[in-house]
């Protein structure tokens, strides 16, 4: 998976209205996305723990939070919004998957000036820990009501991604979880898996996308889960954002940049031994470059990259070396974790005149280029003309997204994984057997 830069995320979500609904984990998803739209840096621990603050990275607190009384009750409200010249991201804090308050939120989105282009939603932990022991009937009934209502009010062009709840730890000490539930953390872990199964099945039943975050993070609770057993650290949330953006790009028919993945915030998991093959070590976390880069994938049929990489320069005769530098494509080194006071935007903001309806809009990141000079002491014959290279990718016109491409669904426990059939290990017979008469 290629990790997108801030300039590429701005391009993918250009002129898009993104709505995120859910609990405190979803609030961290909102914060990391807002930060990634501006800087190539990670969240700090204090930003992850902050709740209901008046401002965060140039966003605003619209309603609730520190404007009123702060508490951990089921009636807590918090509405945040980040608005720039080309992006609008809004967050609604939910304590139940479907309620009268959620109905008011949906009516507000439906009657507002701007209609959402992307909705990211999850609600699980509050539903299974704060509404009594017999919560399953109401939770499943509310799921059915929710997706039925979303099917009615969302437009056909709006993409809804239901992400499953993240895994919880063996010991839960988060404040919103009641003390009597904290002593039964093992049962909460099982309930989260069961709730993810019901919610995923109901979302797919109504034709919505499902991103199984529980599947992706199931093996990383020991290192990236915080001590309260519920919330995750900054590396986990950046990896989550990249998974989410890759899913959105695929759903919108946008081809990701064809560059080698230079880092992974979280490894994919332990490798599997195969007969006759050596077990290779996985890349390290947070910016360690793999020893052997992966080959570039071939472009999918029917898709065109939003910002194609510059073409390779033509081959010249060996006896005519070039005296001028020739730009070549090179992979950018991974971004280290740095304090936000020292971070800077990775690119200039996109201008409105860069976008045209004749092209395809995508989140493909601009390629990073470096230069080297080929020096020669002799020159035979006239100097061949220098090729004209296209301008940098971030200065090219940006296409518009066309929907309708087939979507790729990553493997998860709730749907079959269509992989290539395994080769047979049976050997052919040494002697020809007589054919039956």
From Swiss-Prot:
Biased composition (Basic residues): 417-429
InterPro entries: SGNH_hydro_sf
Positions of region (Disordered): 401-437
Annotated family: Belongs to the PC-esterase family.
Name of this protein: PC-esterase domain-containing protein 1B
Species classification: Eukaryota, Metazoa, Chordata, Craniata, Vertebrata
